[in-house]
Amino acid sequence: MPSHPNFIFRWIGLFSDKFRRQTTGIDENSNLQINGGDSSSSGSDETPVLSSVECYACTQVGVPAFHSTSCDQAHAPEWRASAGSSLVPIQEGSVPNPARTRFRRLKGPFGEVLDPRSKRVQRWNRALLLARGMALAVDPLFFYALSIGRTTGPACLYMDGAFAAVVTVLRTCLDAVHLWHVWLQFRLAYVSRESLVVGCGKLVWDPRAIASHYARSLTGFWFDVIVILPVPQAVFWLVVPKLIREEKVKLIMTILLLIFLFQFLPKIYHCICLMRRMQKVTGYIFGTIWWGFALNLIAYFIASHVAGGCWYVLAIQRVASCIRQQCMRTGNCNLSLACKEEVCYQFVSPTSTVGYPCLSGNLTSVVNKPMCLDSNGPFRYGIYRWALPVISSNSLAVKILYPIFWGLMTLSTFANDLEPTSNWLEVIFSIVMVLSGLLLFTLLIGNIQVFLHAVMAKKRKMQIRCRDMEWWMKRRQLPSRLRQRVRRFERQRWNALGGEDELELIHDLPPGLRRDIKRYLCFDLINKVPLFRGMDDLILDNICDRAKPRVFSKDEKIIREGDPVQRMIFIMRGRVKRIQSLSKGVLATSTLEPGGYLGDELLSWCLRRPFLDRLPPSSATFVCLENIEAFSLGSEDLRYITDHFRYKFANERLKRTARYYSSNWRTWAAVNIQMAWRRRRKRTRGENIGGSMSPVSENSIEGNSERRLLQYAAMFMSIRPHDHLE
């Protein structure tokens, strides 16, 4: 007689062969109809209807992504649908012929084959991970179904049937979720081991191979079966009531702890394997740092929950031992540790009942019950003395929360507060708690510290930079004025950029993605600049791709008059003062508002033909009146844009806009307007005076001539700008 695993494998193989024959027969009939009765497509071939030619994605080398072992024509690559030109039109590939693609879907006996990289499978894996975490938290709740009754009569052991029923329903629902996961595993494509030798791995899409691979894997199907076996439910409803009637308390505790560890440890391993698979396929689990922080915190909480549950069960065993010892000392003791109803449903008991509704009255001589439930009594409880009021409490909240608190406190302090007795089981449990505390602190708390460090890394980086800067300024003995300027600039850059170099963050991204990100960040700001408001989207995309953010602190000089202009700066926030020397002692000042720009000498330098390599000098000094946020275009970037889109910069409207907002043109225009106004005023005054001339008027004429010379000097110093836009 074949073994049970071989029988299952044989059944899966026969079922897959039958389904494949049916699918192959249908596809052959469809091929006959499509090809007009071509006999070459018919026959007894039982191979799946799949092309032997590998798809384009499978033949590429580069990013380690999983590819299929065969080209699925029903799911053509997206790049093929988007390819086309004016000579080769794009064909409508989104509506395939149903007669040809309906029978090419990869289906098996368990349903359609799923791609592990799909969003659907990723969402299901996250939901399963949360369900497995809930299952880890539900299993220790079975321990709290056991309790010791405490009234004016004797103490007895019973099982809270109502609470056990609730926990059983929760556990069964979570096992049903895992059972659905097992069903999906029979449909989920896997990576072929042979394909990992050379290349980046290929997915196996054959339904029969997928089912066979999952069923034969010890860490696959059989491991999942062990995890979802309803062992705790069966033990609590079939075994525990019988053992309570037989008063085998030690055997009850031993069975509970062994069964718990038999399923709890595999569940932990299953969760770890699931998280590793999710990280291997997608590179992340939930995608944010805070989710990782929460997962580690939940794991630490579950570990405390498990430790508290084991502590609760072992405390019940010690109380039962105390009651037996007290009974043996009395001589005439007919003790029954079991209550009259070993399974008691407190939720449906009459409310008029004082205390517990199911207590035993089978004690002929009264045992001093408070002595065994008193932590200050003669019986030494060791580490279980704080559990005495918990195991006899009628409140489920107290029974669940206090052991969790004890577990958190014990694991966090490495069991420093534990004072065990000479009982060997108590000593072993204390050793396990110490080792568990060290292990959890090393793994989970260490991971939490890593996440917190990642969150606080930017702030810490800022603090280290400020400390190093202060040390350097102190070592170089910089004056307090310069130190204050450095501190002001560092604070402003931190407030504006958050301590991050935006260009460095997106530097390694693909060009298309980087361009889209910079367009999203800079497009609205660039549109506010009047010079770029009427340009094409293609030019704006190139400007956004080459724009760099800049920050300047108050009272800082952006550029001095006469210095080479290395970049064109566009002001987004703040005001800039422009100072230009017209002659000795004569300064022309103006203010640039948000939307203005400086360094327009580069624009004429880029458009000039023949081209000169020497950068143009700045015609003015620019000083920040406020904290400035801007973006800049370097000389090479601006030259690239003007060379490739010169047709746009020859536009008459753009020429007028550039001259209107240019600080150089505005200064030149202001000087010429003032000169013309003064000439007109002088001419009108001369007409009013007539021909009368006195010595006083002669002196005034000489003074006017000196002023006229200064005005002409200012006019000639303010040379008409050359923007080469004609």
Curated annotation (Swiss-Prot):
GO terms for MF: calcium channel activity; calmodulin binding; cAMP binding; cGMP binding; intracellularly cAMP-activated cation channel activity; intracellularly cyclic nucleotide-activated monoatomic cation channel activity; inward rectifier potassium channel activity
Pfam assignment, any one: cNMP_binding
Spans traversing the lipid bilayer: 128-148, 163-183, 220-240, 255-275, 283-303, 425-445
Tissues in which the protein is found: Expressed in the whole plant but only weakly in roots. Strongly expressed in the expanded cotyledons of 14-day-old seedlings and detected later in leaves after the transition to flowering. Also detected in flowers during organ senescence and in the dehiscence zone of siliques.
Alphabetical list of PROSITE patterns matching this protein: CNMP_BINDING_3
Keywords: Calmodulin-binding, cAMP, cAMP-binding, Cell membrane, cGMP, cGMP-binding, Ion channel, Ion transport, Ligand-gated ion channel, Membrane, Nucleotide-binding, Plant defense, Transmembrane, Transmembrane helix, Transport
Amino-acid positions noted as binding a nucleoside 3',5'-cyclic phosphate in the UniProt annotation, renumbered to this chain: 531-661
Comment field (misc): Loss-of-function mutations cngc2-1 (dnd1-1) or cncg2-2 results in the loss of the hypersensitive response and leads to a broad spectrum disease resistance. These mutations lead to a specific and dramatic calcium hypersensitivity that results in severe reductions in plant size and seed yield.
Protein's job: Acts as a cyclic nucleotide-gated ion channel. Permeable to potassium and calcium in a cyclic nucleotide-dependent fashion (cAMP or cGMP). Could also transport lithium, cesium and rubium and displays a strong selectivity against sodium. Seems to directly participate in pathogen-induced calcium influx. May function in homeostasis, re-establishing ionic balance after defense action and/or other stimuli. Could mediate the initiation of the developmentally regulated cell death programs.
Assembly behavior: Homotetramer or heterotetramer (Potential). Binds calmodulin-1/4 with a higher affinity than calmodulin-2/3/5.
Protein name per the record: Cyclic nucleotide-gated ion channel 2
Organism: Arabidopsis thaliana
